[in-house]
Curated annotation (Swiss-Prot):
Protein name: G-protein coupled receptor 146
Family membership noted in the UniProt record: Belongs to the G-protein coupled receptor 1 family.
Species this chain originates from: Mus musculus (Mouse)
Subcellular localization: Cell membrane
Gene: Gpr146
Classification via SUPFAM superfamilies: Family A G protein-coupled receptor-like
CDD domains, sorted: 7tmA_GPR146 (cd14990)
Assigned keywords, A-Z: Cell membrane, G-protein coupled receptor, Glycoprotein, Membrane, Receptor, Transducer, Transmembrane, Transmembrane helix
GO molecular function: G protein-coupled receptor activity
Signal peptide positions on this chain: none
Residue intervals annotated with topology Cytoplasmic: 44-64, 123-145, 210-232, 299-333
Sugar attachment sites: N8
Biological process, per Gene Ontology: adenylate cyclase-inhibiting G protein-coupled receptor signaling pathway; defense response to virus; regulation of cholesterol biosynthetic process; response to interferon-beta; response to type II interferon; response to virus
Transmembrane segments: 23-43, 65-85, 102-122, 146-166, 189-209, 233-253, 278-298
GO CC entries: plasma membrane
């Protein structure tokens, strides 16, 4: 993946800076594949399994983190193909056919959209829970509808990439299909629906949460409200996700803005290619950072993990109910 892009034949591609940047990004990718991928697979899988094994104690934030964990597993599975395989790189260990490339692109887009949607909905639902505790909208019983909305919306938004894939095979027979091969239009849709809209939703929710936090209301004495650690987890997750995904969406936005036929000098084109590669690397790294935040900030996760291990140890045998789990269910009732 890591190269100076299409200007390998230009003078700047042979400069020491270009070679050093390529080498540095290659080392980072190897470190991520060697350490980040196992961490991401392990913690994301534990996050999903621990919450599914403790459905009775799941809260709405847990549902969104499960969605982000599943998306993280998808991103982790795609990481080796992206970080080591694109055909334009001198460092590539293998090349991808056009069909495989578009398939990976669709999966990557779906995972990124699920991550951003879940982050935005986490912020909005946290505000609802703070403003109106025990509401139906923030109820965990809406899990099926929420997951359907998040994943269904991500798939529909990525449909433009699917149309591009189909039209690349039938354009010789259907002239109108050639109009759907505009990848810049697909990128613009992803930037608008996958980044701008969730970003505005998060900013709106954080502003409302901040305003509620300054107000002293009788609801603040309600012991059934969300644990304060959830607020820290929310802020850390929002900052992490948008911090790691913003460079990637900015690179897509730049591609859209520079697709009007304007030429870019070779020197700047090389810098932009390296910046795009680094942005995609940061996007992949989000899949390993988020479950670590959940692990170390969410106070309920260690208990869920213990119950998961207990169930795995018991197997098909009947296990005695966990007292801590019963207390947590009673507290949420």
């Amino acid at each position: 993946m890591w190269s100076c892009g299409p200007l390998n034949s230009t003078a700047w591609a042979e400069e020491p800076l270009c070679r050093n940047l390529r080498l540095g990004l290659w080392v980072l990718s190897l470190l991520y594949l060697g350490a980040g991928v196992p961490v991401s697979l392990g913690y994301n899988a534990l996050l999903v399994l621990a919450n599914l094994a403790s459905k009775n104690t799941m809260t709405m934030p847990d549902v969104y983190f499960v969605n982000m964990a599943v998306a993280g597993l998808v991103l982790t599975a795609l990481a080796p193909a992206y970080l080591l395989g694109p055909a334009h790189s001198r460092w590539a260990l293998w090349s991808l056919s056009s069909e495989a490339h578009v398939t990976l692109l669709i999966l990557f887009n779906v995972a990124s959209l699920v991550t951003m949607y879940s982050t935005a909905l986490l912020s909005l639902d946290y505000y609802i829970e703070r403003a109106l505790p025990r509401t139906y909208m923030a109820s965990v019983y809406n899990t099926r509808h929420v997951c359907g909305f998040v994943w269904g919306g991500a798939v529909l938004t990525s449909f433009s990439s699917l149309l591009f894939y189909i039209c690349s095979h039938v354009s010789s027979r259907i002239a109108e299909c050639a109009r759907m091969q505009n990848t810049e239009a697909a990128d613009a849709i992803l930037v608008l629906i996958g980044y701008v809209v969730p970003g505005l939703a998060v900013l709106y929710a954080l502003a409302l949460i901040s305003r509620i936090g300054k107000e002293d209301t009788p609801l603040d004495q309600d012991t059934s409200r969300l644990d304060p650690s959830v607020h820290r987890l929310l802020v850390a997750t929002v900052c992490t996700q948008f911090g790691l995904w913003t460079p990637y969406y900015l690179s897509l936005g730049h591609t859209v803005l520079t697709s009007r036929g304007r030429t870019v000098e070779g020197h700047y084109l090389g810098i932009l290619q390296v910046a795009k590669d680094l942005a995609k690397f940061l996007a992949f790294s989000s899949s390993s950072v988020t479950p670590l935040l959940y692990r170390y900030i969410n106070k309920a996760f260690p208990g869920k993990l213990r119950r998961l291990m207990k169930k795995m140890h018991c197997g098909r045998r009947h296990c005695s109910p966990d007292p801590s789990g019963i207390q947590q269910v009673m507290a949420q009732a």
